Amino acid sequence: MLMLGMNFSATLQLLLPISLTINLLQLSKCHHYVDRAILRGITIFALPAIGLALWASTHWSLSLEVFVAILVLTFSLQDRLGFVRATLDRLLEFQRTYITIMGLVHGASNLGGSMLTALAFGKGLDRHVSRATIVAGYILFATIQLATLYLAGEEWQIDFGVEASLIVSGAITFWLTERYIFTKFDSKKYRKGLEILLIATGILLLLSSF
């Protein structure tokens, strides 16, 4: 969206209601699987960081694509390279620091979701727990972002008709994915899918930084 000439605030105003709707629909089916320890860490450490960084981003912008790309690509290699696994195990011993940095990155660039996915992948969570925790985290992210934009006095720039049609499209996409795709994934396939997602995300972020 930034490439299409929309500023950061307008991009968030377009994407966040859609993301929030889809994730609420997902959470309604899997809320009992949420890893509450991770969610508590997000609430305490990430949300204030998101609010602070997003408020700051309304005054200046910061490019974090390369940082996030390197991080998620590193996480994607943990099942392939033993020394990467050992390094990430040590990194995740400082989970509060990681979550705080994730919040700062998300507030400044909206790229913290990739770091949350990497965290779930790195901890080797069961596919249901991983999915539910990521979804719950996204909901908290979107809620604090929308609240921060409102409190910062950002004028709403997106046509409500366009927003509503995109929300409906997102809900239909979720229903189709839930019905025909997710049910076909066991834990092994889900983890492989996350690995591919992290690799693709990292490559796309690197490409977008040039």
Q: Where in this protein do the model-derived segments appear?
A:
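Small-residue-rich hydrophobic segments that form or flank transmembrane alpha-helices
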Residues: 1-40, 99, 103-107, 111-170
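A helix-boundary/kink motif common to multi-pass secondary transporters
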Residues: 7-8, 60-61, 126, 186-190
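Residues within membrane-spanning alpha-helices of integral membrane proteins
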Residues: 16, 69-72, 76, 135, ...
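Transmembrane helix exit motif
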Residues: 25-33, 54, 62, 66-91, ...
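Interfacial loop-to-transmembrane junctions
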Residues: 37, 41, 177-200
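Hydrophobic alpha-helical transmembrane segments in multi-pass integral membrane proteins
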Residues: 52-57, 61, 65, 105-112, ...
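Membrane-interface helix termini and inter-helical loops of multi-pass transporters
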Residues: 54-62, 86-88, 149-162, 184, ...
